[in-house]
C-alpha cells in the first residue's frame, strides 16, 4: 500500500536523541500526493461506521487534510480543535502536552449528545489525544470511534489505559538507525 511504501522511504531527522520521520501525512512536506490522501481516507472509512457519526473531530494542523477528505467522501461535517482561542460561546479550553510542546487547544462546534469520530495523523505520546478526549467529554459528546493513521511509541496504549477508549491505527512504525521500520 502507498502509505506503507511512502513511510519506508521517507526522510528522518535527529533532534537530540529522538529520530523524527518526515512524511506528507504527518508533516505536509515535501508534497502531499492526492492518491495517498485518498488511500488513507478510504482505509479510515472501512474502519468506521459513519451512519453513527454526527461530526468528525481533529486537532490542528495535520489532521485537517484528513478530516477534510473524509468529510467530502462521507458528507459528515468536521470540527477542528484550534491552538488559539476564539472566545465563542461554549468554547472549551483544554491543556495539551506532547513529547515536544505544551499548550492549549480550544474546542468549538460540539453540542451535548453529538456522536463523534476523532481522527489524527499520528499518535506517539498520547498527549494530543488525551486533550481531545477530555474536551469532548466536557462538551458532553459521545465518542463513537477514534482513528489515528500512524502509531509510534506507547501513546496508543497510554491513552487506552487512561481513558478506556480503543484506538484504531492504520500502520505502526518505529525509526531505527535513520530508517522507518513498519512493525
From Swiss-Prot:
Name of the protein described by the UniProt record: Hypoxanthine/guanine phosphoribosyltransferase
Organism: Methanotorris igneus (strain DSM 5666 / JCM 11834 / Kol 5)
GO cellular component: cytoplasm
Database matches in InterPro entries: HGPRTase-like, PRibTrfase_dom, PRTase-like, Pur/Pyrimidine_PRTase
EC number from the UniProt entry: 2.4.2.8
Pfam families given in the database record: Pribosyltran
Record keywords: Cytoplasm, Glycosyltransferase, Purine salvage, Transferase
Spans through the membrane: none
Function, as annotated: Catalyzes a salvage reaction resulting in the formation of IMP that is energically less costly than de novo synthesis.
Cellular compartments annotated: Cytoplasm
Reaction it catalyzes: IMP + diphosphate = hypoxanthine + 5-phospho-alpha-D-ribose 1-diphosphate; GMP + diphosphate = guanine + 5-phospho-alpha-D-ribose 1-diphosphate
GO molecular function term, any single one: hypoxanthine phosphoribosyltransferase activity
KW Acyltransferase (keyword) present: no
Superkingdom per UniProt: Archaea
Subunit structure: Homodimer.
